[in-house]
Amino acid sequence: MSASNIPTLKLPGGKIVPRLGQGTWRMGESARRRAEEVAALKLGLELGMTLIDTAEMYGDGEAERIVAEAIEGRRDEVFIVSKVLPQNASRAGTIAACERSLKRLNTDRLDLYLLHWRGRYPLKETLAGFQALLRDGLIKAWGVINFDVDDMEELAALPGGDAVATNRCSTISRGGASRPTSSRGPARVAFPSWPIRPSSRAASCATARLPAWPRATGRRRRKWRSPGCSGTRT
């Protein structure tokens, strides 16, 4: 694998990103693995996987610090995605969470900032936080993950809600990221996918056969769940 043979995707807004990126779920949980995790991310960058997905939840923020170490001196080459936890997703909380992530990542902006899943705060509050961060240049785009059709339609109905860049779904289970879209939702949403059991044979097969960032089709799809999958949020 090399950078030249990794397919790319144009996000709403025109940004080009690799379809195959690096996730950091479970990173930052053990100091003994830190050097290996940093090295793995660096190797991925060398192979052209310049999209790195992280979150304030991962390792209680330590995964973001590992990303910062791995991309030191290469920030402009990397597309960084991070996420705000739903309990932090008020307008003020979203802004504060982003600022903490920026500090841990040692960067002045996020390329994409996501709401990790629905919580108690109204979407309009989270959206107001995203819009403030966009205005101040702290994020370049925003999105959501683990959203069902009804969630996406509610978001699209808000002023500015149709600017959503992404909603994520699983290649193994729709338990936490259900039906991708509908005819009334945003028309140009990218759907990055994730295996809920990264080390399993099933996950390997699924990710090999399904596109990493399937496009919205504009029609409603039925929920489905692979047997034995719990719908784990990542």
Regions found by a protein language model. Name each.
Residues 11-12, 45-46, 67-76, 99-108, ...:
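Acidic (Asp/Glu)-rich catalytic clusters
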Residues 77-89, 112-116, 146, 169-171:
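A short, structured active-site edge motif that brings together acidic residues
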Residues 23-35, 82-92, 116, 121:
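Active-site mouth loops of central-metabolism enzymes
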